[in-house]
């Protein structure tokens, strides 16, 4: 069995005590003091190596593209500012045209997203992972029936409220005294 010696070094200017282990064989104390670990410490795993091999070129190329885009934007801005000043009467119609073009591009993207979700729904339907169309129709019918019932109930409540207000207004008109020239009426 290996033994561990501990030697104490004291620095006259330092008031703290430093322990320095001496090793015989491969035994030490604590983590990282020469003891053999139970886990494999042979280096990076194959997943990490593959991620590095794939990630560095992809990340580098994306970083280069970002730099080129930034440089192009700065150069374009430097060239376009004097043109904006010279051709300012043309800029407003151009801005409107660009705004309409951007709106058209966004609408196109929205239509594409709608089409993609429709295709996804069809594929899920064909695979059988979603509800069938009759089940969806039954669910929609139940929801519509609930909505119609709710609207009917609210209509009845509103009709009752209006009727109560009409009776209340009629009752207050009967209990008041009205005096007209030539007649005196009193209702109670």
From Swiss-Prot:
Keywords: Acetylation, Lipid droplet, Membrane, Transmembrane, Transmembrane helix. Residues 172-181 have a biased composition (Polar residues). GO terms for biological process: post-embryonic development; reproductive structure development. GO terms for cellular component: membrane; monolayer-surrounded lipid storage body. Its main location: other. It is found in: Lipid droplet; Membrane. The modification N-acetylalanine is found at residue 2. The keyword ATP-binding does not apply. The keyword Disulfide bond does not apply. The chain crosses the membrane at residues 49-69, 74-94, 96-116. InterPro entries: Oleosin. Pfam families: Oleosin (PF01277). It is a multi-pass membrane protein. Residues 52-125 are annotated as: Hydrophobic. Residues 2-51 are annotated as: Polar. Residues 164-188 are annotated as: Disordered. Belongs to the oleosin family. May have a structural role to stabilize the lipid body during desiccation of the seed by preventing coalescence of the oil. Probably interacts with both lipid and phospholipid moieties of lipid bodies. May also provide recognition signals for specific lipase anchorage in lipolysis during seedling growth. PANTHER family: GENOME ASSEMBLY, CHROMOSOME: A09, OLEOSIN. This is Oleosin S2-2. It comes from Brassica napus (Rape).
